[in-house]
UniProtKB/Swiss-Prot annotation:
This is Spiderine-1b. Keywords: Antibiotic, Antimicrobial, Cytolysis, Disulfide bond, Knottin, Secreted, Signal, Toxin. It is found in: Secreted. GO terms for cellular component: extracellular region. The presence of a 'disulfide through disulfide knot' structurally defines this protein as a knottin. The N-terminal part of the mature protein (59-100) probably forms an alpha-helix which acts as a membrane-active peptide. It is necessary and sufficient for the toxin's antimicrobial, insecticidal, cytolytic and cytotoxic activity. Residues 1-18 form the signal peptide. GO terms for molecular function: toxin activity. Residues 113-166 form the Oxytoxin-type inhibitor cystine knot (ICK) domain. GO terms for biological process: defense response to bacterium; killing of cells of another organism. Residues 19-58 form a propeptide.
């Protein structure tokens, strides 16, 4: 264990030094670009820059922007009347709500219409999750503090190993 910590420290030290050198190279190139920009500004008067900006604003096609916005609004209004879109929106809202409710709570607490934990909820084993879900731990057993285990949708290679309730 001590060897692993020493190795981790050496790797961290190496990464800090490597990124430090990279940062100084980036800072030097950014400083050069800034110096060139300041030289350019020094050569050009502010009045001519303002005149150029005003001319660009006058040339801009505001009518095209407004017509595109109007078309986008009409498409959104048409989509909002579509039944499939409404179903997808409802599903998305429910999924976001389930993911947002990913805090720990007592097993058996109602989540929606179920008496089990929602997808994305922190879990300790498969028995915390609904029968059609499983408890997934991305970090395995070696680092549970860094990545929490959550209830996930059961896929073909994963199964809920909790014994059925009697």
């Amino acid at each position: 264990m001590k060897f692993a910590l020493v190795l981790l420290g050496i790797c961290a030290f190496y990464l800090v030094n490597a990124t430090g050198d990279l940062e100084t190279e980036l800072e030097a190139s950014e400083l050069q670009e800034l110096q060139e920009a300041l030289d350019l500004i020094g050569e050009t008067s502010l009045e001519s820059l303002e005149a150029e900006e005003l001319e660009e604003a006058r040339k801009f096609k505001w009518g095209k922007l407004f017509s595109a916005a109007k078309k986008l609004y009409k498409k959104g209004k048409k989509l909002s009347k579509n039944k499939n879109f409404k179903k997808a929106l409802k599903f998305g809202k429910q999924l976001a709500k389930n993911l947002q409710a990913g805090e720990e709570h007592e097993p058996g607490t109602p989540v929606g219409n179920n008496k089990c934990w929602a997808i994305g909820t922190t879990c300790s084993d498969d028995c915390d999750c609904c029968p059609e879900h499983h408890c997934h731990c991305p970090a395995g057993k070696w680092l549970p503090g860094l990545f929490r285990c959550t209830c996930q949708v059961t896929e073909s290679d994963k199964v809920n190993k909790c014994p059925p309730a009697e």
